[in-house]
Amino acid sequence: MNKYHISLELPKILLTLSEMTSCEEARLAALSLQPSGDFFEVQKRLSETEAAHILIAKFGAPSFGGLINVNNQLSRASSGGTLSMRELLDISCDLRVIRGITEWRSKSAGMDTAIDDLFNSLYTNKYLEDKINNAVLSDTEMSDNASPALKDIRRHKRLEESKIRDKLDGMIRSPKYKSSLQDAIITQRNGRFVVPVKAEHRSEVSGMVHDTSGSGATVFIEPAVVIEANNRIKVLESRERDEIERILSELSEEAGSFADTIKISCESAAELNLIFSKAQLAYKMKATMPIINSRGVIELKKARHPLLDPKKAVPIDVSLGDKYDSLVITGPNTGGKTVSIKTIGLLTLMAECGLFIPANENSSIAVFKNVFADIGEEQSIEQSLSTFSAHMTTIVNISNSVDESSLVLIDELGAGTDPVEGAALAVAVLEDLRRKGAKIAATTHYSELKEYALRTN
């Protein structure tokens, strides 16, 4: 992130935006969002946010919950790989979310919006969604109805298990084995049905020992009368695994055949999620859509710093770039000077990200290719004062980079040195920046700088 954007606290706004998203792709996109210095790109971004803002007002927000990045899974499937049950369910979940978004959009049929292209890139696939859901019940469970063969295998398996239980039930109820059994229960060891036998009565129960208790007092025996039935179950379980693998392969092949449209749909849905999150942030901040221009003009009406309590923040009116290109803000310490220039800078960056701004309607924001800031920290919201040396290093770096498409914000210009020298230095810096065509907002407590501002256009 640009260090000037950090000093203006844009990352905090983007963090708040990211917390309003529903999917990881949109969250990461929010956190990495960069202001654009291109007028038409900013116009496009704001138009998209406006479209979502209007749709939310009329129909409420669509749900993006459950959207997952399945690009890797789809790539594997389209290359012939077999997906797990969890991976197939993730694809089905995305298809459900996409279907839900398109159904929500149908409420506004006939409305033309700036985000129609994204909505039109959502491809529903109820066929694949249902096919996966009808076959896969959970991460580890395949439905009996996934295929006729699987249903038949499991039916035979249940019959064999029932026969074994009947035989073992008869055995544990028989007086013949009452004294031999540790408990009158049927359990399993190594996937085979066994009964718990007292170790000292081991010879009284014919069968195969599969396990011994920790104390050695109990042995778990598979009685001879059920060995063949247990063997048949093992064969059926092997066939069951093979059939499940075949079904997973078939479903994966189906998913792979639709990989391209699903990827496009998921990408469009994630982008829509970000746009609607911008609109929801606007509602949260009671923000409005700024009027943007490429003339370097900023006209803010009752603007508020978005990170301050709106009940306590003092709104400001700002005019810069129309009648004059430099704005010098004066006043005592703790008078709100730093917050004022931070507000100018942050709202500019927000607009360039496609975000509405906390200001009255018809406020104007210019699109700048670069926004530079040297924020002194006496009035900083959270950080400490930088040294004069660091302050001047930043000023020099800014001076070397500015042009007529730049906005420069400087807090306590010339502070940290002798007042007379500091005032002279401040005037020289402003003259240099003005000569290069930059729009400037600076704060100061030097009376000389106030006088300079009054006699300068």
Task: Report residues per predicted region.
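Conserved amphipathic alpha-helical "coupling/scaffold" segments
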Residues: 1-149, 153, 258-261, 265-271, ...
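Amphipathic alpha-helical transducer elements in NTP-driven molecular machines
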Residues: 11, 43-49, 64-67, 95, ...
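Extended, charged coiled-coil "arm/hinge" scaffolds of SMC/Rad50-like chromosome-maintenance ATPases
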Residues: 124-141, 228-249
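Extended, Lys/Arg-enriched charged tracts that mediate electrostatic binding to polyanionic substrates
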Residues: 151-201
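Long, charged, glycine-rich C-terminal linkers/tails
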Residues: 172-189, 279-302, 360
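SMC-family hinge/dimerization module
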Residues: 189-220, 230, 292-315
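Non-transmembrane, heptad-repeat alpha-helical coiled-coil rod segments
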Residues: 237-271
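ATPase nucleotide-binding head domains, primarily ABC-like/P-loop NTPase cores
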Residues: 285-288, 293-457
